[in-house]
């Protein structure tokens, strides 16, 4: 790594410690010894009186020096349960960082901060949130999540105990702020980051992590396949306030020089333990790719498009046997139960084109991973199920219905899905259409897609675009599902828009910077921020200004009709009309006399 790159990690940019808008502030929910993060958005007064602040979910975590990392929020909670122990852990070696590190003799930028001593469950103990929930215990993590979601703690415990929700919190990632994934809760989004053999660096990936969580990523997956895989992950985990996921087969493949058939259970198992000890919160495991399912993909247009799925399919064919992931699944469960690592059961046979959607291969694998979910639950290991992919809009909901049936209501986690294949460069949009639809139907978490999908490795700008697009899709689904409080944000924006409170509109935006920039392209002067029009219609044709003028000019006539004015006492107006209705005999219809006929 260059000196300039290292320096940028040591000296974070100003944006990292600033709010996304001056009207935003950190305003936690405080309950006992818990402090649960939220963002408060201050609003200007309306002509009719003050507006309450709007409070929204916050993922960015506290400020920190990235070379030091975050404070271990959950360390005391974990320690107080007295069911874990510290131990030496596996011995680190250069193969963990890949072939380039072995050639150099070192990783390019070693982690200099404190590295926690690995912990695991004591002999005979299980330390998963599902285990505690099944014992009737409401943990600090569950209390934290309940406050964050504005839900009852007992409801949170019940959903986890039933396998319908997960709190992915490895005991070796005490820096993480507990969050929950389940269809009864706010729809979550995941952002993928990670280097490749072609591009990126540790500095860039740490910056992407902090950037993604700044804009609202609920979890982040490190999908690094290039240099310094272990060290990059260490930097990411120690700086992450959100759960970190991985696909461990990628690192295992690097350890055998990229030759899939040389993979062994022993190498994979060692890689999994390495990542458990570092603090990875959930892992994608493609254990549902069975030998018998591979021929089902031969008539597809796009074959097997999952990297993990294709790796395991290649291994199965080379050895002509079931994958070691499937054969050793129970041992994986035992390992995960020691650290509270959640399964993200991978859809290695997901469709890579709308033509291949909902085919025999996809659904055969879904049935199998549904069976694996039940096996994981026997070990009290938390599970979510991965889904497609590329699916036409009319076929999306079938995926929700079959996942809930075959995977027994385990949380569903989907990549989009993309609903058309014709828009390279715009696949964040093609996928967000499907994402909103599938989330409305019950999917719990959405994996973002960036504009670079199918084209290249996303940079920081692409990460922001992907996160904002998917926050939009997730929120739209929450509004459609009637999630408590979801629409309050929309209503605050609508009121600010009608009253031409431009600064409030910017503050309430998912992306204030872009909203301000677009407004100021044509009306940059500060007085335009109080004008009752924008450049779309101008002052003469603004429909909202005209609507306000109508209300002002004909207020008395509107009052005669019994229609409360904006800002008026609507309840009092309705009560008065109710009294009038009763006084007239509570008749829906009354006779209208023709005065001319009786003259």
UniProtKB/Swiss-Prot annotation:
Q: What class of enzyme is it?
A: lyase
Q: Which residues bind substrate?
A: 192, 221, 250, 286, 306-308, 347-350, 386, 413
Which cofactors is this protein said to need?
A: [4Fe-4S] cluster
What does the cofactor section's free text say about binding? Binds 1 [4Fe-4S] cluster per subunit. The cluster is coordinated with 3 cysteines and an exchangeable S-adenosyl-L-methionine.
Q: Which GO terms describe its molecular function?
A: 4 iron, 4 sulfur cluster binding; carbon-carbon lyase activity; zinc ion binding
Where do the annotations place [4Fe-4S] cluster binding?
534, 537, 542
EC numbers listed for it are 4.1.99.17
Q: Where is the composition biased (Basic and acidic residues)?
A: 87-100
Region annotated Disordered, chain positions: 1-53, 82-108
Would you tell me the protein name for this molecule? Phosphomethylpyrimidine synthase
Q: What is the lineage of its organism?
A: Bacteria, Bacillati, Actinomycetota, Actinomycetes, Mycobacteriales
């Amino acid at each position: 790594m260059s000196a300039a790159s290292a320096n940028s990690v040591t000296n974070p940019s100003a944006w990292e410690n600033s709010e996304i808008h001056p009207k935003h502030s950190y305003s936690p929910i405080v309950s006992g010894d818990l402090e649960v993060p939220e963002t408060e958005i201050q609003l200007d007064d309306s002509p009719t009186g003050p507006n309450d602040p709007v409070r929204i979910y916050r993922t960015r975590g506290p400020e920190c020096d990235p070379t030091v990392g975050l404070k271990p929020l959950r360390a005391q909670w974990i320690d107080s349960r007295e069911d874990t122990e510290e131990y030496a852990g596996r011995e680190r070696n250069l193969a963990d960082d890949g072939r380039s590190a072995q050639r150099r003799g070192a990783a390019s930028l070693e982690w200099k901060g404190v590295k926690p001593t690995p912990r695991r469950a004591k002999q005979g103990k299980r330390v998963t949130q599902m285990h505690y929930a099944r014992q009737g215990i409401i943990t600090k993590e569950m209390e934290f999540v309940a406050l964050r979601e504005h839900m009852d703690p007992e409801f949170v415990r019940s959903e986890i105990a039933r396998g319908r929700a997960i709190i992915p919190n490895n005991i070796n990632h005490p820096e993480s702020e507990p969050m929950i994934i389940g269809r009864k809760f706010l729809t979550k989004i995941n952002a993928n980051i990670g280097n490749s053999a072609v591009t990126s660096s540790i500095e860039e990936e740490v910056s992407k992590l902090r950037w993604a969580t700044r804009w609202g990523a609920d979890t982040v997956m490190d999908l690094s396949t290039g240099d310094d895989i272990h060290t990059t992950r260490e930097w990411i985990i120690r700086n992450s306030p959100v759960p970190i996921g991985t696909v461990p087969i990628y690192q295992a493949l690097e350890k055998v020089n990229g030759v899939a058939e040389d993979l062994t259970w022993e190498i994979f198992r060692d890689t999994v333990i390495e990542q458990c000890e570092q603090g990875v919160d959930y892992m994608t495991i493609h254990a549902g790719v069975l030998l018998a399912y591979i021929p089902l993909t031969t008539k597809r247009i796009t074959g097997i498009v999952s990297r993990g799925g294709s790796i395991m399919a290649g291994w199965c064919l080379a050895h002509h046997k079931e994958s070691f992931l499937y054969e050793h699944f129970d041992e994986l469960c035992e390992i995960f139960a020691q650290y509270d690592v959640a399964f993200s059961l991978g859809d290695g046979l997901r469709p890579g084109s709308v033509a291949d959607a909902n085919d025999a291969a996809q659904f055969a694998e879904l049935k199998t991973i549904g069976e694996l979910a039940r096996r994981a639950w026997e070990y009290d290991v938390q599970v979510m199920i991965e889904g497609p992919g590329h699916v036409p809009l009319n076929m999306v909901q079938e995926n929700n219905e079959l996942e809930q049936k075959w995977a027994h209501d385990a949380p569903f986690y989907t990549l989009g899905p993309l609903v058309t294949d014709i828009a390279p460069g715009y696949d964040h949009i093609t996928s967000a259409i499907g994402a909103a639809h599938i989330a409305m139907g019950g999917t719990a978490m959405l994996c973002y897609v960036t504009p670079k999908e199918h084209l290249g490795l996303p940079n920081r700008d692409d990460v922001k675009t992907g996160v904002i697009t998917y926050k939009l899709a997730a929120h739209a689904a929450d509004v459609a599902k009637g999630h408590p409080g979801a629409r309050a944000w929309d209503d605050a924006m609508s009121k600010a828009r009608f009253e031409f409170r431009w600064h409030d509109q910017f503050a309430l935006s998912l992306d204030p910077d872009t909203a301000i920039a677009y407004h100021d392209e044509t009306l940059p002067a500060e007085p335009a921020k109080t004008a009752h029009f924008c450049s779309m219609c101008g002052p003469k044709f603004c429909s909202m200004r005209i609507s306000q003028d109508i209300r002002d000019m004909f207020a008395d006539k509107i009052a005669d009709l019994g229609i409360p004015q904006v800002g008026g006492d609507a309840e009092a107006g309705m009560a008065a009309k109710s009294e009038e209705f009763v006084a007239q005999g509570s008749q829906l219809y009354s006779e209208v006399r023709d005065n001319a006929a009786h003259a």
